[in-house]
Regions:
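Long, aromatic- and glycine/proline-rich binding clefts that accommodate carbohydrate-like moieties
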Residues: 48, 303, 308, 357-409, ...
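Hinge/lid segment of periplasmic solute-binding proteins
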Residues: 113-165, 181, 190, 216-221, ...
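A structural signal for short loop-to-beta-strand junctions that line the ligand-binding cleft
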Residues: 99, 106-109, 137-174, 204, ...
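Extracytoplasmic/periplasmic solute-binding protein
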Residues: 153, 157-161, 166, 190-239, ...
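Conserved C-terminal helix/tail region of periplasmic/extracytoplasmic solute-binding proteins
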Residues: 2, 24, 30, 49, ...
Length: 438
């Protein structure tokens, strides 16, 4: 059993005289004021941690971001941008974002996304609208296609950062040798390819992405545009895959194989396989993305090629399938204002110039295509602007991923000969219509 003993404390206080009382009173007040100021100034700095803004990104680009992330964090001591490096496969990054959102509380404040993810993510309620944070005048500085690709039901959900667009690469030296101009139409492309092959100047005429993957859908979007067709009308939900223009587009691609213009293996080629064929001097024409330019400029065909918009039918125009990446804000984030601060930083011209000089990516701001620093290093940028200013978007529908899978499967069947173009496109159209009605 515990025992407690009382302790007596006796304090003798003598009454101070009036002079000492005044001195100690003022001294005490001064000390209290000083301590209060120190607490107000120092304690928040000690106890307040920077707000962390998280974003998931492909590992390669995450590494390329490191200088910008360091600069941002130094410039914003109360914020900390944290980059989570994911796989380099963009489909897997999309899956990781999707899984995080489906769990109900995504750890990511920023969403760095491909243009084709916008509709799916916005329709699911996973993104916050950016419309109240940016004016239309500010958006006018960007490529129109990139801005429109970031909208869903009239609201903006994605701020453009860098763009991409499909184009035609061609060998200037080979065309000069036969005294020809670059092709403008599908027929001219076939004729020039055949001439160059007959004169044994090049093994193959034209290479393109025929493998069953997203690149096949992107490539076909451009051919379809060149024939005056369409995939899905996002406003009316009408499907155009079984119309004559779409069937003619498939027949053109089949003809490049059957007539020996393209190699039989083209139906297994993605971007890199086609780039290597062109870069090694084995093809006169190539459909690909801007990244090829820098690589080909450091190869045996350096100075012997140029770019132009894709070929098309005489009565129709060219269209570049628009790709590219931009920023959204997670609807579940508690740090939405801070996430917008990051977007504002990445939108500054000087930040973008620094990044694009280092990486060779293509800016989404139109003025940067003629920026002296960028043009001095990437002389093709003004020509590239002519390409990306005539974009064709993949269908901006929430079910895009499933629609693309349908198209890829049936295109592959038609290109490999297991179905006729009519059979394949009719089946693709029927499945797509059923998908849109779900």
């Amino acid at each position: 059993m515990f025992k407690f003993h009382a302790i007596k404390l006796r304090i003798n206080i003598r009454p101070p005289n009036s002079k000492s009382q005044g001195f100690w009173l003022h001294f005490g007040l001064a000390i209290a004021t000083f301590v209060g100021i120190i607490c107000l100034a120092v304690l928040p700095a000690i106890t307040q941690q920077p707000v962390t803004v998280k974003v998931l990104i492909q590992a390669l680009e995450g590494t390329q971001w490191e200088p910008l992330v360091e600069d941002f964090n130094n410039e914003h001591p109360n914020l900390r941008l944290e980059v989570v490096k994911g796989p380099n496969n963009t489909n897997l990054v999309e899956d990781l974002y999707t899984s995080a959102f489906l769990l109900g509380d995504s750890p990511y404040d920023l969403v760095y996304m491909d243009i084709v993810w916008v509709q799916k993510f916005a329709a699911a309620g996973w993104l916050s609208s950016l419309s109240d944070r940016v004016t239309e005048t500010q958006l006018d500085a960007y490529l129109e296609g990139d801005v429109n690709g970031g909208r869903y039901e009239g609201k903006l959900y994605r701020m453009p950062f860098r763009t991409d667009g499909g184009m035609l690469y061609y060998r200037t030296d080979l065309l000069k040798e036969i005294g020809a101009e670059p092709p403008e139409t599908f027929e001219e492309l076939m004729t020039l390819s055949n001439t160059l092959q007959e004169q044994e100047l090049v093994p193959w005429g034209y290479v393109w992405q025929g493998k069953q993957y997203e690149g096949l859908s992107a490539m076909f979007t451009e051919i379809l545009e060149g024939y005056g067709g369409f995939w899905i009308d996002a406003d009316t939900q009408e499907v155009g895959l079984d119309k004559p223009e779409a069937i003619a587009a498939v027949e053109f691609l089949r003809d490049t194989i059957s007539e020996g213009i393209s190699p039989p293996g083209v139906t297994t080629y993605a971007e890199e396989e086609t780039r290597r064929l062109f870069q090694n001097g084995n093809s006169a024409f190539l459909r690909n993305w801007p990244y090829v330019y820098s690589l080909a400029s450091d190869s045996e065909i350096a100075g012997k090629f140029a770019i132009k918009p894709m070929v098309h039918q005489p009565e129709h125009g060219s269209g570049a399938c628009l790709g590219g990446w931009g920023f959204g804000i997670s609807a579940s984030s508690d740090n939405q204002d801070e996430a917008w601060t990051v977007i504002e930083y990445f939108s500054r011209p000087e930040v973008q110039i620094k990044y694009f000089l280092e990486t060779g990516y293509v800016p989404a701001k139109t003025s940067l295509f003629n920026d002296p620093q960028l043009v001095a290093k990437f002389s093709y940028l003004p020509d590239l602007l002519n390409v990306v200013q005539n974009p064709v978007l993949r269908p901006p529908v929430a079910q895009y991923a499933q629609a693309s899978d349908i198209l890829q499967r049936y295109l592959s069947a038609a290109l490999t000969g297991s179905q006729t173009p009519e059979q394949a496109m009719q089946a693709a159209a029927n499945e797509t219509r059923a998908l849109l009605k779900r």
